[in-house]
Amino acid sequence: MNQEFYNAVKESVQMSQQRWVEWRHEMTGLLHCGSCLSLHKCWFVFEKAPVSPLHEKCHCTTVAIPASQVKSNAVAKSDYSKYNPYLFDPTNFYKHGKNKAFESWGYTISDSEWLQNEIEKQGKQQYLLGNYELGVLNMRGQRISIRVTIPRKNGTGEVSFVTGWMVNPGGEIKLNTPYGGK
């Protein structure tokens, strides 16, 4: 059995064993918390969902949803502009220096499309496996961190780094930053 097939079977089994929940904000009362509203209909692995209730007057609940629903509908999205010009920053407009890491691994701005596809693929895969960490939660939403691994283009081996995402309703995660650190 080849390694790729074995890994696919292993991931499928892992995914089917995950318990998923959908966050639901019940529209009762007059006032609503921005953080709670931003979580409405977002999906999380049960063990890695934000703690409910979030606050004393929280009306939110979590409802179990089938892993098959998550697997069928989950999607990872990223804007091309997160790679070109943001990540590689050819005009030094952003002044974040993230391009230096990728360039040291042999990547250039011409690799932006490949990086976008690969980071989306691995982001979705790791989200489905529950391999994410909760980050900041506020009225804009719940951020998660997902570790991805890419091959070095200028040598042997791989490099692993953290990517930053926002959890959106219905199983969508959207990339905030393609490089959040090692």
Residue ranges and their predicted role:
Residues M1-H55, V63-Q126:
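Domain-core detector
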